[in-house]
């Protein structure tokens, strides 16, 4: 049994998108989407910080210069270490009011990012790619309802993507630019809602389940191999961190259930016995 403990007791309405940076992968960063916050904590020193934007922030992807790419509702935007904001290419005008949700950087440096409509209109959202130099945005998938977890296999040739309300994980072939050959590799029950995810160093998929109180690992053959139970309902995402990338950090949401679960919205940490991959930074 893998036991968890509280890593950070700041309660997030909707904690999401953890990343680990720094020389020892010890600087954790994540967002509280609906409060527009970007939070951080150092594993080794326990030093914390945060800043707040004036709109919802779906993700905060670290940049090589120390700033972030922020998935603000009207973005995405670049934010430097001094807080200065500059724009990136925008997606097409939304038919339905939408925001950015999850994102990750490929090994080639491109930013993959997805959307959701606030009313969760079926197939009204998409998955996009912003080029590593920030000059171009391209829509990769258009039949998306709630774009969520995404990551790549260790050899980078397989791209994984979760559209939460479809209740499965899709895999694609990836050539460093395009995604092709879409196929479903893991199916869940209609009451199971997969959220954020990450891939470990053995090609296992660690998936957080919204309203499921769990993070699960599926091995390289897509078979369930581990379960991590949490004392909250809404687990949202996870990432590996620490000098040896052997610690799994898990974000959660309180979703107005702090009375039912006192630790709801806090961020947790555990040692699952498997090492992960480093966070890839965005280069501009």
Predicted regions and their residues:
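Hydrophobic alpha-helical segments and helix pairs
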Residues: 84-140
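Conserved beta-strand positions in repeat-built beta-propeller and related beta-rich domains
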Residues: 21-23, 28-34, 69-74, 113-121, ...
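Loop/turn-rich, solvent-exposed surfaces of beta-rich toroidal or solenoidal domains
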Residues: 168, 186-220
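Short loop/turn segments that connect beta-strands within beta-propeller blades
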Residues: 42-46, 80-84, 131-134, 173-177, ...
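A short beta-strand motif characteristic of beta-propeller blades
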Residues: 3-9, 46-52, 86-93, 135-142, ...
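Blade-level signature of beta-propeller repeat domains, shared across WD40, Kelch, NHL, RCC1
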Residues: 239-284
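Beta-rich, blade/repeat-based domains predominating
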Residues: 10-25, 53-69, 94-110, 140-158, ...
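A short loop-to-beta-strand structural motif that recurs across blades of beta-propeller domains
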Residues: 37-39, 75-77, 125-128, 168-170, ...
